[in-house]
Amino acid sequence: MREITIVTGFFDIGRDKYAFYSRSVEKYLDYFRFWARIQNQIVVYTTPELAPKVMEIRGEFGLADKTVVIEVEDVFEVEPALYERMAEVELKPDFHQFRANADPEWPDNKANYDYIMLMKYWCLYDAVEKGLATGMLAWLDFGFNHGGKSFSDAADFDYLWQTDLDDKVHLFSLSDPNKIHAGFQLQFLSECLMGAPVILPDSLADDLWNLTKKAMEALVMLDCIDDDQQLLMMSYRERPEIFDVHLSDWFMPMKEYGGQHLKMVEKVEEKRSFLAEIKLKLYFIKRRLLFCKRIYDAAKRYKV
């Protein structure tokens, strides 16, 4: 078994003002505190303003000496030209018309959100380049587990996460990615490969960063942007030999690969009334009809 160095990061992009999945900075810090007692070495990328708070949280568990905080003044200056192109795509009406969910406020349709998702893989690469992460690494989202959504007991994270996975980029997926068309995923915003965790050896951090960056560059050539799930799918398509894909579910890879003791929140099947079921079905029918109309109108414009 090999100890994992965890790389994570948090940058305030105004999620508290998002129309969907709105979360404040304090909420994210609370999410981090829930799992921050993990005994592994952690490298955290964040802004100078938040760096002391991150170190304070790890210090609460006596783990300041196993924590490195990298202050990034402006994360959008890491790849400024690429971000500028992404921001231009966000403003294109036809990009939104192409997507099954055309709402410009949907996170996946926003340039700043998608750029931050790309930065996960830059952080992994940069941590290796700086000599801060060696051996087996894992990207773990700063807000992992959403403060107890899947794993119920924060005390369970007081352990050393280790792995016996081999030297490949290990991705975790909701379904078989070989049965998913990457173009349809881009259009329908369907979910397959999960953006976290990603477990890999330090020797492949550079490859993963270059692949995901290349994927985003390819998307903007098509006047599109998308989040980490799409970038990983495209990277997997480009170099499948360096990846190993494991079927799993949200947050579950940590339990399945080294954290078997983590207690789960009991799942309660949501029961809807007959009227609620009808309303939900009508909502999706309406959304699909609107999508079909947008594509039909686009086909007429392009004289298809």
State where each predicted segment sits.
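N-proximal low-complexity "stem/linker" segments adjacent to membrane-targeting elements
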Residues: 1-27
